Amino acid sequence: MEPPMEQSGGEQEPGAVRLLDLPWEDVLLPHVLNWVPLRQLLRLQRVSRAFRALVQLHLARLRRFDAAQVGPQIPRAALARLLRDAEGLQELALAPCHEWLSDEDLVPVLARNPQLRSVALAGCGQLSRRALGALAEGCPRLQRLSLAHCDWVDGLALRGLADRCPALEELDLTACRQLKDEAIVYLAQRRGAGLRSLSLAVNANVGDTAVQELARNCPQLEHLDLTGCLRVGSDGVRTLAEYCPALRSLRVRHCHHVAEPSLSRLRKRGVDIDVEPPLHQALVLLQDMAGFAPFVNLQV
């Protein structure tokens, strides 16, 4: 795209080259604007019509959009303008829009961007199954999705996601309290083979049935967050230890039915667990690592 002609505000030195005289497609867009924070670009477009055209062209070519880069809060009209021409997005994060973002705001954006691979909608409580259905059906390459604190996500919504997202690898369902074991079991059976990271934190409806099914169907699972899942117990953790060789981190804080013996096998494999071992176990580990046996009375 050629830069539009615009009158200079003053005289230009002979031989001088203005920023906008540089090739837009080959120089300014890939090598300049890509390194300028989005908030600064929005200010830049107020300078002149030419700068506005340049910024709009940049926005249309965006691959990644994070509303947090604009500010802690972003008005509905501003988001619509920013994403009006974007058709190549691969990453979309809209958490700062959580107070007002609706299906009507989101669905058109999803329809224009079928290449999306990562979508973050944490806390967006005004959405519904319709938005999730549009995402699942229209974005087959989706790999990462955050629906944390989206109370509207229920078993039916999750089933639709599991049926239509073959590339799904990371899923955050923190505090999606309508989800029960049956929905997680379905997810595991449909998409478990590719799942690497899953959060079911802060959901008292999730228990050992779901965890055991995840373990048996998710051989590549690396990160599992069960924080506050009060129905999860030692049986589920033992199954994880048996069937998940790739597991690297496990979060079980406030899971009061998970006992240390079920965690010890994972600890020996080097899995990062957010619950400290009992004092006796800690002293034994210290003895093994540093050879402090003569100085430690393990009977205390």
Swiss-Prot record:
Expressed in heart, liver, spleen, bone, muscle, brain and kidney (at protein level). The keyword Acetylation applies. Keywords: Acetylation, Cytoplasm, Leucine-rich repeat, Repeat, Ubl conjugation pathway. Gene3D superfamilies: Ribonuclease Inhibitor. InterPro entries: F-box-like_dom_sf, F-box_dom, Leu-rich_rpt, Leu-rich_rpt_Cys-con_subtyp, LRR_dom_sf, LRR_FXL15/At3g58940/PEG3-like. Pathway: Protein modification; protein ubiquitination. Residues 113-269 are annotated as: Interaction with SMURF1. LRR repeats lie at residues 141-162, 167-188, 194-215, 220-241, 246-267. The modification N-acetylmethionine is found at M1. One of its GO terms (biological process) is dorsal/ventral pattern formation. Its main location: cytoplasm. Residues 19-66 form the F-box domain. It is found in: Cytoplasm. One of its GO terms (cellular component) is cytoplasm. The keyword Isomerase does not apply. Belongs to the FBXL15 family. Part of the SCF (SKP1-CUL1-F-box) E3 ubiquitin-protein ligase complex SCF(FBXL15) composed of CUL1, SKP1, RBX1 and FBXL15. Substrate recognition component of a SCF (SKP1-CUL1-F-box protein) E3 ubiquitin-protein ligase complex which mediates the ubiquitination and subsequent proteasomal degradation of SMURF1, thereby acting as a positive regulator of the BMP signaling pathway. Required for dorsal/ventral pattern formation and bone mass maintenance. Also mediates ubiquitination of SMURF2 and WWP2. This is F-box/LRR-repeat protein 15. It comes from Mus musculus. The gene is Fbxl15.
